[in-house]
Every structure is written in structure tokens, then in C-alpha cells.
């Protein structure tokens, strides 16, 4: 894949386009290609929270198309790394929480779901004012209770 250099403003505009495409895309392979392009742009500006957030949004769109547990786990790990880098960003944390919930819905082993729930609990404790993260945590607790 040809790496193209962008300035920050152009990179944000390009990521906006990639996000829009990933939201409309139904093909997983095409969405993976969009996520890869987004990763390349993110790696050019790894300190930009705005770039990281758009990359996170594209990863969430990809996660909704992933059926295989291993693929989804890889995507969740990428979001976890983004969240660790931008620890104080409730927006990036929310996108990580969304993928954790998606992951929990694919997991079949109780211990796996509990480990995912613990990660969501930690996010919810850090971002107590985020009703959106709390909602994802409540949903995973509901899953565990059934």
C-alpha cells in the first residue's frame, strides 16, 4: 500500500472521508483496507488526539463487520492501545468500550466475558460521568446475569 504524506489538516479531512466510507461499507475486507489507511495516517501523527479519535471510530466500524473472535480481539487490542495512550480522552474510551461490548457478545467462555467486563468496569470507574460508557458496562453485566 502506498503511503501518502499529509499535513495534519489534510490528514483529518482524509480520515473523515475514510470514516464515512467505513460507516457505509458492508464488506469486511474493504473495511479492513480503510482501517489500514487510517492506521498509516495515525502513525504519522501519533500525538494527535483528533487523529486517534477518527482512527478509533473507523476501528469500531470494522469491529461490527468482524465475525471471527481472533480478528475482533486484534481490533480491540488496537483500541486498548489508543485508550492507554490517550488516557484522559472520554471519546476514545467510549469507542474502546463499544468494541469491548461487541467482543463480549462474541465470546462464549464465561471467564473471557468476565475479563472483558472487568476492563469495561475499569473504564466506567475512570469515566464516571460518561453515561455512554456506563450503558455499555450495564449491558455486559446484563449479559453476565443471564
Which residues make up each language-model segment?
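A conserved position within tetratricopeptide repeats
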Residues: 2, 35, 39-42, 46-49, ...
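Intrinsically disordered, low-complexity polyampholyte segments enriched for Lys and acidic residues
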Residues: 3-5, 28, 61, 81, ...
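Amphipathic alpha-helical repeat scaffolds of TPR domains
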Residues: 4-23, 47-64, 90-104, 131-145
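Alpha-solenoid repeat scaffolds
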Residues: 25, 29, 48, 65-70, ...
Amino acid at each position: 500500500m502506498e503511503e501518502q504524506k499529509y499535513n495534519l489538516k489534510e490528514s483529518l479531512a482524509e480520515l473523515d472521508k475514510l470514516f464515512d466510507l467505513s460507516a457505509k461499507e458492508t464488506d469486511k475486507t474493504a473495511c479492513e483496507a480503510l482501517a489500514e489507511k487510517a492506521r498509516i495516517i495515525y502513525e504519522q501523527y501519533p500525538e494527535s488526539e483528533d487523529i486517534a479519535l477518527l482512527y478509533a471510530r473507523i476501528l469500531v466500524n470494522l469491529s461490527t463487520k468482524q465475525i471471527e473472535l481472533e480478528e475482533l480481539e486484534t481490533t480491540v487490542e488496537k483500541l486498548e492501545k489508543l485508550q492507554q495512550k490517550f488516557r484522559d480522552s472520554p471519546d476514545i474510551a467510549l469507542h474502546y468500550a463499544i468494541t469491548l461490548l461487541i467482543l463480549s457478545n462474541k465470546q462464549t467462555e464465561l471467564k473471557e466475558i468476565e475479563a472483558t467486563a472487568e476492563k469495561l468496569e475499569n473504564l466506567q470507574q475512570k469515566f464516571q460521568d460518561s453515561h455512554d460508557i456506563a450503558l455499555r458496562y450495564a449491558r455486559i453485566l446484563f449479559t453476565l446475569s443471564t
